[in-house]
């Protein structure tokens, strides 16, 4: 018998909580869980007891690494919450959670306003079309300034953000908030952990400011809503319900961002934030249709939410749970799924059985018989499903838009202490790379050592820590290395001829290939321009494969060759001696021969580095950037500090955190994200080739 849905779709919210590191995102989530009755004791992040941060590394470092999903209930609504990390090394976690959310809360620190990582996650949310509310948190903190935070939303994000609340007091005098729609004040009782508050008239000394803010809000809503504009111009009364409905519509259309105030740590304003989630953020029925593709015809299909439609879901995260093994987090877009039934992994075109279904609450779990359209849940039993795969009804295959996964930019070698550790390391690396697509492991063809690659030093630190802790691997870890690449800068043609005839069956493969640079990010493109069968059709795939394998090891210093076009235009074969293997070798010889005149260069990752430091340290900061081969792209004032925008090679950024700390007496901060690849200077290229012991001579 089919199970009954507990909450209708219009009373379901899938939301994420996103912010810059330390803006109080995890504490905000904690309080939401506390007030919705999910937990009975509040856990503080700085004590290492937070509910959502369940990995030991998170509790020790006080930061959120993986996006834990949990379900809470508020005023007859189901709210599925995903807590996302604020550190740039974990952008894949932010990306994958935004991909499956319908709305988000952006948490700001009331003293700092919009910070660099806030800008990154805001941009990502805009890319995925996620409606947002803003919660100006830490209103109790010294230096808290609601108006300044509002200014940063306008100046740094160009967001059409408007206050729907106004704080009463700030710093240690922060007492509560004024609702600018209802025009009432909510004052909190300090002793009741935020569970009790009084709704009273707006205090006299706030009446004038609140009335002005109320009028500003109506004008701002009128700008994005014709119905409100007409009433406003006619001087007609606008009811609170009409105002809220207009704000909801504009928020869902990404034309308006409501701003609220509070202090999660001091338990103030969180219930009003929950009310705003229900009032202004979309249900799965309100968002625009999801894009999918029919794998059989290639036609675009629009998916809309509904239990009566065929099942379609996206696997957005794979995690290994110490008790139940492999968990696959799924977001259901349409249809329903019962535990024990079969699904089609449309991405890989194979059937899998879902053993059990779990509703997750951070790291506690509750078994459920069925999931419905709009739900977020975890499935057990999916052995071959990885992040970004589409799971659908067996008879209705669909491929949903997947995730953008950036390439790793930094790598370290890891050497196990014993044969037993090598086995544990292999298992650990396989599981961790399944969980996190930006984490890669490979064996160096030159040295035979294992290399692990990721998005930054902290990312790799945490992965190594997990290998030691969860998989009990004893290993030595090398110094961080840059993940260089190689490419061609000139067009050239070369022959590759492989002939071996010494009695018995010989080997014969002969190709002429034209190589040319491809656009950045386009990767390798192969073109077959053979006419008249001078290279038989059955050997063409072997030529392409031979090139791919040779490119993986580069031509200068062993780094992968990227962004190259190859056109096979001539060659010859032998009736008896030709084989796929011979043509593979011939193709690799052509690549090697071409590399001498193709202007081969080594590419290095260039990072977008933003440094925020007080004005008096500006000279030192800019000097350090220049000394690290960096280019300063621009500066802007950030409150009483300066933000320096620059492009710096990753190779020069190791140890920068320590340098910046000492140069600014601990007051400077920086964020770093990968931007693009660029050719290294000639002198450095020669050093890299020498260090890696090899390469080919290149003609300029």
Curated annotation (Swiss-Prot):
Q: Cross-referenced CDD domains, in alphabetical order?
A: EF-G, EFG_III, EFG_mtEFG1_IV, EFG_mtEFG_C, EFG_mtEFG_II
Q: Summarize the protein's role.
A: Catalyzes the GTP-dependent ribosomal translocation step during translation elongation. During this step, the ribosome changes from the pre-translocational (PRE) to the post-translocational (POST) state as the newly formed A-site-bound peptidyl-tRNA and P-site-bound deacylated tRNA move to the P and E sites, respectively. Catalyzes the coordinated movement of the two tRNA molecules, the mRNA and conformational changes in the ribosome.
Name the predominant localization: cytoplasm
Lineage runs: Bacteria, Bacillati, Bacillota, Bacilli, Lactobacillales
Q: Where in the cell is it found?
A: Cytoplasm
Q: Which GO terms describe its biological process?
A: ribosome disassembly
Q: Which GO terms describe its cellular component?
A: cytoplasm
Glycoprotein: is it a keyword of this entry? no
Q: Which NCBIfam families match?
A: EF-G (TIGR00484), PRK12740.1-3 (NF009379), PRK12740.1-5 (NF009381), small_GTP (TIGR00231)
Supply the name of the protein.
Answer: Elongation factor G
Which cysteines pair up through disulfides? They are none
* Pfam hit, one: EFG_III
Species this protein is from: Lacticaseibacillus paracasei (strain ATCC 334 / BCRC 17002 / CCUG 31169 / CIP 107868 / KCTC 3260 / NRRL B-441)
In the record, the note on similarity to other proteins reads: Belongs to the TRAFAC class translation factor GTPase superfamily. Classic translation factor GTPase family. EF-G/EF-2 subfamily.
Locate the tr-type G domain: which residues?
10-285
Q: Which regions span the lipid bilayer? A: none
Recorded GO MF terms: GTP binding; GTPase activity; translation elongation factor activity
Q: Where GTP is bound, by residue?
A: 19-26, 83-87, 137-140
Q: Which gene encodes it?
A: fusA
Record key words, sorted:
Cytoplasm, Elongation factor, GTP-binding, Nucleotide-binding, Protein biosynthesis
